[in-house]
Amino acid sequence: MKIKLVIPDSQDHVSLVGRALKGILEENFPESEVLFLIELAVCEAVANCIKHAYADQGLNKVEVELEIGDSEIVIEVKDEGRKPDPCFMDRKEFQQSCNPESIQEGGRGIPIINQVMDHVDCYSFCKKNILVMKKKIPAQKT
């Protein structure tokens, strides 16, 4: 099954993507913790796309494609905005600090995505930036 959502590049629509994704996945997978983590990773990806690719302009669109296969879920977040830094996906760890005043507000999205998903890749093709996230799923009972 493959589903495509297209939203305006507004932070107001990030939660809509999360709710739609959760509703679709709940029909197929009962494990709520995994669903919550996938929803979190996708919402972080969409929010980052809006913030960094389009700089919150509100004039463009973000595409989210969900494909549910036999052994994995594949989610692609696509935009036509500014190309990301090639090294931005390398952030695996969260910022560690004992001083609350030195902790930055942002910068958690990529580490969350990398820790939640089994495979993450980012590339540009035909003027589109594409973030691919894959999560292995247990075999479905018939």
Regions found by a protein language model. Give the residues of each.
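Short beta-strand-loop-beta element adjacent to the nucleotide/active-site pocket used for signaling
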Residues: E67-I75
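Glycine-rich ATP-binding loops of the HATPase_c
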Residues: D118-S124
